[in-house]
Amino acid sequence: KEGYAMDHEGCKLSCFIRPSGYCGRECGYKKGSSGYCAWPACYCYGLPNWVKVWERATNRCGKK
């Protein structure tokens, strides 16, 4: 599957001020095949189905 990588708070993983290759590495840590900075957040490809990705309908970023 593909989608925006999330941090531990459910927010999109920001790549705004990250070095080149950051998103590819982060997506790899999540078992994805590749990823890139879709400014300003990391977008991943080839993720296993069990990995949670950001979705507008279930967005919990900044909410308690």
UniProtKB/Swiss-Prot annotation:
Pfam families: Toxin_3
Database matches in InterPro entries: LCN-type_CS_alpha_beta_dom, Scorpion_toxin-like, Scorpion_toxin-like_sf, Scorpion_toxinL, Scorpion_toxinL/defensin
GO terms assigned for molecular function: sodium channel inhibitor activity; toxin activity
Subcellular location: Secreted
CDD domains: neurotoxins_LC_scorpion
Coiled-coil ranges (or none): none
Annotated disulfide bonds: C11-C61, C15-C37, C23-C42, C27-C44
Residues bearing the modification Cysteine amide: C61
UniProt domain LCN-type CS-alpha/beta: residue ranges: 1-62
Record GO cellular component, one term: extracellular region
Tissue specificity as recorded in UniProt: Expressed by the venom gland.
Keywords: Amidation, Disulfide bond, Ion channel impairing toxin, Neurotoxin, Secreted, Toxin, Voltage-gated sodium channel impairing toxin
GO BP: defense response
Similarity comment text for this entry: Belongs to the long (4 C-C) scorpion toxin superfamily. Sodium channel inhibitor family. Beta subfamily.
Note on domains (UniProt): Has the structural arrangement of an alpha-helix connected to antiparallel beta-sheets by disulfide bonds (CS-alpha/beta).
Role, per record: Beta toxins bind voltage-independently at site-4 of sodium channels (Nav) and shift the voltage of activation toward more negative potentials thereby affecting sodium channel activation and promoting spontaneous and repetitive firing.
Protein name listed in UniProt: Toxin Tco-gamma
Organism: Tityus costatus
